């Protein structure tokens, strides 16, 4: 494995907690929508060895055919890396592994039905990449559920809307915001509780979804507690993960 120096070409702070940025794409770098790659900073002026870098895995938000690699990152106040990332600007140097990883891939799911992508926080990145790759060639409809604490952290809805419009798939797509700690009732998402609890309470059925493996395929990406809770409620409804070459009805990513 080698580490490439890349340049920040685009950077937008959505608020004091969340930012979206893009870097130059190294020659020969390949990935599949849904995968992640380690990205970070150098700890010394002339980095040569693995210990000279501070790297963390981030889901890729861009499409494989784009000439850039994009990320959606949340600040961790006591984190080692994200405070450094939030100090960067366009033109600065970051570092990227030469290999992408991850098995949260649409191709590991049975085809057909409605694909529901459940994301917490910046786990949403992977689903933007997937939606850019025309998932309707495999599924009838696509739904993205983004769970965040407050409405101000639901920041990529417009990016999804633009992507879907470019593909002419508005009638086959829905974005659902889920807020768990929004103090202003006028800003709450369609779901105003934790998503696993919303499933248990039948909220998705009230919105018109039959959340069973006969009709739905599910993808999960986010923090470990979210992923574990989602896996449990889906398993309780009969969803199964892929095993070997056998396709599943849900797939999850957890790279913490």
Where are the model-predicted features located?
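Conserved S-adenosyl-L-methionine
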Residues: 135-142
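Reductase modules of NAD(P)H-dependent flavoproteins
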Residues: 2, 145, 150-256
């Amino acid at each position: 494995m080698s580490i490439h120096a890349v340049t920040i070409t685009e950077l937008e702070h959505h608020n004091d907690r969340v930012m979206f940025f893009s870097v130059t794409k190294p020659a020969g770098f390949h990935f599949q929508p849904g995968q992640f790659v380690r990205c970070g900073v150098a700890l010394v002026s002339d980095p040569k060895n693995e210990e000279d870098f501070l790297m963390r895995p981030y889901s890729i938000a861009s499409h494989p055919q784009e000439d850039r690699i994009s990320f959606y990152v949340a600040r961790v106040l006591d984190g080692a890396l994200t405070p450094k990332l939030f100090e960067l600007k366009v033109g600065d140097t970051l570092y990227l592994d030469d290999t992408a990883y991850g098995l949260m891939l649409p191709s590991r799911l049975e085809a057909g039905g409605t694909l529901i992508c459940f994301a917490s926080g910046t786990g949403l990145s992977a689903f933007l990449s997937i939606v850019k790759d025309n998932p309707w060639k495999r599924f009838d409809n696509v739904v993205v559920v983004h769970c965040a604490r407050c409405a101000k952290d639901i920041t990529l809805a417009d990016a999804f809307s633009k992507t879907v419009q470019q593909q002419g798939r508005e009638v086959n797509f829905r974005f659902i915001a889920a807020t768990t700690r929004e103090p202003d009732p006028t800003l709450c998402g369609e779901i105003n509780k934790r998503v696993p609890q919303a499933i248990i309470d039948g909220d998705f059925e009230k919105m018109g979804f039959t959340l069973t493996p006969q009709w739905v395929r599910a993808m999960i990406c986010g923090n470990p507690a979210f992923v574990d809770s989602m896996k449990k409620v889906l398993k309780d409804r009969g969803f199964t993960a892929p095993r070997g070459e056998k396709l599943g009805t849900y797939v999850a990513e957890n790279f913490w």
